[in-house]
């Protein structure tokens, strides 16, 4: 069968498209991220910072979710007996974390190694001047002798947040001969200087009663944080684990770094 010039052109276009698809499948880190040398922590920190700034809307073609805001899903919180005056059951739905990607300062990123015989233990440290969680809330509880049963919008502002993320990732060899990182554990630990709660529709928005109740709740920030903060950390861990796993899914670990 003799190929016409048009057929040859179409054949080449098909081959180029196939090659392009094969390259895209393992093209490494998306621009503007760059590879670093393994032990060059300053470069690793800079690339982590770039990731937060450059991909606030996520990377849809790689199934990487948005970083601003970050979807935290639903959190269920029950007071743990830290205060006799405050008892509650709180459901936060459609929760989202704001202000991280556009204000975070990455301080340290350590733990990468050439040894693929055991899991990697990564530690990421970062600071954020203010984070904000917004959600729909449903609360059933009491403050002193005052019942609090309400639904509405909730905002939690957290100031001067120091975060440590501990990530365990296992190298898994695939049929292509390359090893890829599979995250097996992700923990978030935070230290917060202070915070503030705001809830709409308390007591049918009776202004005087609402404001006096919020004043007492915010005076009890440290007590409330003992119950609320771990649940936010847990939700953040789940969200970031999915984001990072999607980023790493098709990047062979041997393509993470420049040659030494």
Swiss-Prot record:
InterPro entries assigned: Haemolymph_juvenile_hormone-bd, To_sf
One Pfam family of this chain: JHBP
Keyword Transport on entry: no
Protein name (Swiss-Prot/TrEMBL): Circadian clock-controlled protein daywake
Entry's family note: Belongs to the TO family.
Signal peptide: 1-25
Alphabetical keyword list: Biological rhythms, Signal
Annotated function: Component of the circadian clock or downstream effector of clock function. Required for suppressing daytime sleep (siesta) under ambient environmental temperatures. Part of a heat avoidance mechanism that modulates daytime sleep behavior under different environmental temperatures to minimize the risk of heat exposure. Under cooler ambient temperatures, suppresses daytime sleep (siesta) and thus allows for longer periods of daytime activity.
GO cellular component terms, A-Z: extracellular space
One record GO biological process: positive regulation of circadian sleep/wake cycle, wakefulness
């Amino acid at each position: 069968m003799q190929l016409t010039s048009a057929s040859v052109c179409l054949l080449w276009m098909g081959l180029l498209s196939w090659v392009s698809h094969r390259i895209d499948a393992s093209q490494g880190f998306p621009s503007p991220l760059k590879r670093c040398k393994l032990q060059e922590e300053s470069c690793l920190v800079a690339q982590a910072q770039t990731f937060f700034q450059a991909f606030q809307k996520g990377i849809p073609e790689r199934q990487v979710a948005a970083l601003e805001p970050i979807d935290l899903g639903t959190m269920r919180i029950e007071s743990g007996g830290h205060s006799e005056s405050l008892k509650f059951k709180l459901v936060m739905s459609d929760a989202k974390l704001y202000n991280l990607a556009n204000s975070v300062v990455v301080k340290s990123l350590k733990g990468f190694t050439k040894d693929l015989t055991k899991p990697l233990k990564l530690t990421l440290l970062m600071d954020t001047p203010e984070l904000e969680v917004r959600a729909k809330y449903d609360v059933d509880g009491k403050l002193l002798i005052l019942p609090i049963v309400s639904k509405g919008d909730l905002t939690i502002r957290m100031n001067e947040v120091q975060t440590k993320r501990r990530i365990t990732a296992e190298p898994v060899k695939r049929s292509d001969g390359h090893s890829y990182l599979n995250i097996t554990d992700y923990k978030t630990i935070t230290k917060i200087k202070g915070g503030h709660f705001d809830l709409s529709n308390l007591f049918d928005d009776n202004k005087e009663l609402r404001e006096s109740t919020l004043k007492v709740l915010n005076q009890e920030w440290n007590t409330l944080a003992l119950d609320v903060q771990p649940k936010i950390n847990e939700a953040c861990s789940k969200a970031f684990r999915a984001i990072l796993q999607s980023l790493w899914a098709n990047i062979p670990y041997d393509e993470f770094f420049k040659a030494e």
